[in-house]
């Protein structure tokens, strides 16, 4: 599988994903991980918090690791620094995830190679919430409900 970096690929990944394990999810509403996970939960995804520091986040049980999650997950969304991603990639492979997603500003080629070699799809340096809103029309949550993003002025 190649690295997913085009609109068609991102649309497919988001449309096929039902469950998202969010590694590094914070219980604090003002943290980017919480904001993105809440958005995805509000848009019908099953969000599975992964953070050893909490027992519950967003009304869901919080697990200390991917391995501790009962049952399968479709996507592993990483809110950790780039150096922390390779072990998470190995856990995602062991868990049987389909997608390893590294958030905006995060790229790790070693982690990508681990996931790609095991057949996972990989997204790097993109925010799942931003991509969902941009591609699948969840723009109304941000206060815009056109369904279309344009760089051109109307008129």
Where are these regions (language model features)?
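Glycine-rich, highly charged phosphate/nucleotide-binding loops
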Residues: 1-6, 56-86
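Conserved beta-strand elements of the Class I
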Residues: 21-23
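NAD(P)-binding Rossmann-fold cofactor-contacting core
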Residues: 26-30, 38-57
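A short helix->loop->beta-strand "cap" motif at the edges of active sites that frequently abuts
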Residues: 43-45, 95-98, 118-120
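Short, charged, surface-exposed secondary-structure boundary motifs
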Residues: 57-60, 74, 110-113, 131-137
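Mid-chain, well-packed structural core segment of small domains
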Residues: 71-109
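Rossmann-fold NAD(P)-binding glycine/threonine-rich loop
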Residues: 104-130
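A charged, well-structured terminal subsegment
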Residues: 131-155
């Amino acid at each position: 599988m190649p690295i997913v970096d085009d609109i068609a690929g991102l649309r497919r990944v988001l449309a096929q994903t039902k469950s998202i394990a969010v590694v590094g999810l914070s219980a604090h509403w003002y943290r980017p991980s919480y904001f993105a996970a809440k958005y995805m939960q509000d848009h019908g995804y099953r969000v599975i918090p992964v953070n050893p520091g909490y027992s519950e986040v967003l009304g869901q049980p919080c697990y200390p690791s991917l391995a501790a999650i009962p049952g399968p997950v479709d996507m592993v969304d990483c809110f950790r620094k780039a150096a922390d991603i390779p072990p998470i990639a190995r856990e995602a492979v062991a868990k049987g995830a389909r997608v390893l997603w590294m958030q905006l500003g995060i790229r790790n080629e070693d982690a990508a190679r681990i996931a790609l070699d095991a057949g996972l799809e990989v997204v790097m340096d993109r925010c799942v919430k931003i991509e969902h809103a941009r591609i699948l029309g969840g723009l109304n949550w941000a206060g815009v409900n056109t369904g279309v993003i344009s760089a051109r002025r109307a008129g």
